[in-house]
Amino acid sequence: IGGVIIMGDRGTGKSTTIRAITDILPKIEVVKEDPFNSHPTDFDLMSEEVRKKIENGETVETIQKKVSMIDLPLGATEDRVCGTIDIEKALTEGVKAFEPGLLAKANRGILYVDEVNLLDDHLVDILLDSAASGWNTVEREGISIRHPARFVLVGSGNPEEGELRPQLLDRFGMHSEIRTVRDPELRVQIVEQRSSFDKNPQECLKEHKEEQENFKQRIVTAQKLLPDISLDYDLRVKISQVCGELDVDGLRGDIVTNRAAKAYAAYNNKNEVSVEDI
């Protein structure tokens, strides 16, 4: 779908909600001890080293692990984001000595940028390149290393603190806005839940464990259903008609709405997209 951006007031739980996502996502299969979270069978999601092993008929050991949630700090350097090549080692030992960056760790996971509207322009450009191609290329002194960087981009921020660059905003498939709760009873409920968690975190987690497991199972079922979800031609035309009337630039709006509607239908355990899903 292309990630999600959550904008809203300070102290409304944006970061807390986003960081909790990994607890409800099913585990993924990755190649053991691989810094890029390589997929064991999909060539578009594996490093060159793993691909060569598979092409040579070697077996690769795999493990199940939680989906990675990688934070991209606002002041991060280009080397920290993209990774670095040890030139001295490469020249003296003849090996590609690569120290993976945040993009490598985020492959097949979630890359989270808090206060995304304050991100430096040079980091925005790096994100745009990786988000568009799904690959990260690092070149130093004639040495080039390329690895998969297919991640879900998630951003949050307060719109009052600055505007988001249109090019980056265009990379987020979905947008959510959070406002401060005004209803006194609901505010009390939130404060009480927070107090109870602070007193006994383990007990609070245990209380919601069953509900969370059901939620996780619902996502697993939806993932299996998704490839077979059908979207009627007339509804596809309606989506494009609405996007046209809203003067949406390009075709990303059409594509995202089609994909999101299918995902929502799968989440609701349906085989066909309805108007309500759209």
Regions found by a protein language model. Name each.
Residues 160-161, 165-167, 181-189, 217, ...:
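P-loop NTPase catalytic core
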Residues 26, 132, 177, 196, ...:
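Generic secondary-structure signature for well-ordered alpha-helical cores
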Residues 80-82, 164-222:
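Conserved AAA+ ATPase core "coupling" helix
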Residues 1-185:
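Conserved ASCE/P-loop NTPase catalytic core
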Residues 2, 136, 196, 271-273:
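Conserved hydrophobic residue
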Residues 16, 20, 80, 126, ...:
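Alpha-helical scaffold segments in soluble metabolic enzymes
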